[in-house]
Amino acid sequence: MTSASAFHFESLVWDWPIAIYLFLIGISAGLVTLAILLRRFHPEAGGSDSTLLRTTLVLGPGAIIFGLLILVFHLTRPWTFWKLMFHYSFTSVMSMGVMLFQLYMVVLVLWLAKIFEKEVIALQQRWLPRLGIVQKVLTLITPFHRALETLMLVLAVLLGAYTGFLLSALKSYPFLNNPILPVLFLFSGISSGAAVALIAMALRHRSNPHSTEAHFVHRMEVPVVWLEIFLLAAFFVGLALGDDGKMRALAAALGGGFWTWWFWLGVAGLGLILPMLLKPWANRSSTFHGVLAVCGASLTGVLLLRFFILYAGQLTVA
């Protein structure tokens, strides 16, 4: 299989914009999950001055919006997307996802607005002085903020897993119809969120790379990566022990060819092994370049994993 035919084949239904969309959704869910856990375990480090929280403020909703824009304009008839926004079907995975996105965005905006309350009120008083309802809403949220935060954590986990459910719903593709996929995408999303957060921290605090939140993200990152490796192994073992369709799908993906090299060099080599090899050097040097090398490789590996699962998963039809 050539590189051209690897991205264009007869059984292909979803192509590269979907992979980028899944990648961006994972970053948002990962950042929000880490931010909430930071506030629970280290409340003093999870205020409005936190780099992790500020990164979440920008990329939490930003990645979702950008990902949805990619998805909408990739549709054959993008102007019909509004129907999905208001016509719900509990039997459609896509429709359930739209409902989840809407609830996620509403709760995310309220949660972030309360954390950055002083900044929000200052902006409101400067630009929209007559919009006094903003302060009233933020005051009403105060007694329920912790419950709102718990709900936000649940929604972030569901959103991270949903990216895997979306693909596993393609039942005619044995490779994708796998119950491990949602969990794998959840933890790889948290891994990508950790990488983005550490890059942001290194950019903002070049003179102090050992802050409380940086230590917290590092502690979270290590078990998440090992769990990601375990889930990948379990994913492939499940295919190997499955029926004829799953074994054919595994052989097509890892039995040689373009996507086999993509996985071993890109996902495993660049995304998992290289960051582990570079980490001791990055920890000793404590420089921005070290963090960028490790986290950049990890982030690229997560993106390559999305491409691998999406394309290799559509090579074989049941």
Task: Spell out what each predicted region is.
Residues 1-12, 47, 86-88, 119-142, ...:
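Extramembrane terminal tails and long inter-domain/linker segments of multi-pass membrane proteins
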Residues 1-43, 307, 311-315:
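N-terminal signal-anchor module of multipass membrane proteins
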Residues 1-3, 76-83, 241-249:
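Peri-membrane helix termini and adjoining interfacial loops of integral membrane proteins
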Residues 15, 47-61, 95-100, 142-150, ...:
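Alpha-helical transmembrane segments and their helix-start/interface "positive-inside/aromatic belt" motifs
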Residues 22-27, 41-44, 107-286:
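Long, contiguous internal "core" modules enriched in hydrophobic/ aromatic residues
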Residues 27-107:
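Membrane helical hairpin/interfacial module
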Residues 160, 231, 298-305:
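Aromatic-anchored segments of alpha-helical transmembrane domains
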Residues 279-301:
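Interfacial loop-to-transmembrane junctions
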